[in-house]
Structure formats: structure tokens, C-alpha cells
């Protein structure tokens, strides 16, 4: 009954793709930011002092954005702390996201360490758009496989529409870095999501399946691309992909 109701709702609003129907065109990919030139410590300290003084007054969003841009015109470890502060606390998601981008262009090891910490920040967790930028920043600057346990749970924790960008950022990271630990996540999200047993009392409600279906529709082609990056193969179903992976396990 649950499957029937969900199918009816989805069919009426936005029919699932059939057979060989063309995929929904992907959204334009934002251009990667250019690396920043190094700033000497004296100039960096002066920039941070100016930023901190300006932060004490009441400012518009445009003024706050300008301050962030002026702070991080270059790269220096001194910029990491104030950028983290903006990423967590600014009133504007636009300003917070820009701070994360600029943070990702700061020197290692300070910047990658700060980005990893932001993954666990409650303030960032409450803003999926900012969290998506954090994942993209990690992919850009210093991702290593030890970070995967912090990133993986973010994908399926919620399939609400506002988290689609985060899920796409995770898939982009997997594709870019060929993260083989993500194989199970990809298999779990390759097929059209429907309940395995609609009569199971522990089965999530219809609203869950509806949200998950629309999320899946948005990024399903990216799941296929991530699997291709890992295997060099194209798969139509999770069973097909699993059979190949089981047969070709990494040594």
C-alpha cells in the first residue's frame, strides 16, 4: 500500500524517468577558485587586525562580504581563524560560503585541519549549504581517505531538498579522489529508492521515500559517474555493480 501511494504521488507531480529517457541536464558546475598568492606574516597580521576592528561594528551583508574579501586577498595561516569564525557565525549564508571557499585556499596543514573541524561544527551542520561548501573545500585542499568516516554519514542522514547540494558535493569528492571506501554508499544510492518491505513496521513513512526519490533524481547520474571513476565501468543497477566489485576486489 505504501509503495502504491508513493508511486501515485510521484507520478502525479513529476513522473519518474522511463527506460531510455534522456537524463535531466546537470546544473552548471561552478568554476574552481584560483590559488591565492602567499602573503607575508607582517602584512597578514595587519589585515587580521583591520578585519577584527571592523567586525566590532554593525555592518550590512555587503560590507561584511567586502571585509572577508579584503582579509583573504592572499594566503597566510593567520587568516584561518577569522575565516572559520565567519564560516560559523555570519548571519548570511552567502558570506559564510565565501569564507569557506577562501579558507580552502589557505596554507596546509592549518586550512585542511580547520575544514575537517568544521565538518563536526554544530553551527555548520545546521546550514547544509555551508556544509556542502566545506566538503567541496576539503576535496579542493587536502582530502585524504582518513576523512571519509567523517564525511560518509552526512550523505544519508537526511534527504531533504536543502541537502541535495551537500550530497552532490560528496559525490564530487568521491569522483575526484576515487574514494573506494564510498563503494557501499554508491551501491545504496544507484537504484531507484523504494521500500524493500512496505509491511515492515520499521519502514520509514511515505514522506521519506518521496524526499529520497527527488534527491536521487537530482544526483543519480553523479552516482553513476562516481562508480565509473572507481571502476572504469558503467552499470545500470546496483546488483550489476556489486557483482563486478565482488569479482574485482582491490588487493
Where are these regions (language model features)?
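Terminal, low-structured helical/coil segments at or just beyond the last alpha-helical repeat
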Residues: 225-251
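Structural detector for internal amphipathic alpha-helices that build alpha-solenoid repeat scaffolds
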Residues: 29-41, 62-76, 85-88, 94-108, ...
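Cleaved targeting-peptide boundary
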Residues: 11-36, 235
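Short, structured interface segments that constitute the first stable element of a domain
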Residues: 154-159, 165-169
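Amphipathic alpha-helical scaffolding segments comprising HEAT/armadillo-like alpha-solenoid repeats
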Residues: 40-54, 76-89, 97, 108-122, ...
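Sec-dependent N-terminal signal peptides
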Residues: 1-14
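Charged, low-complexity interaction regions
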Residues: 56-61
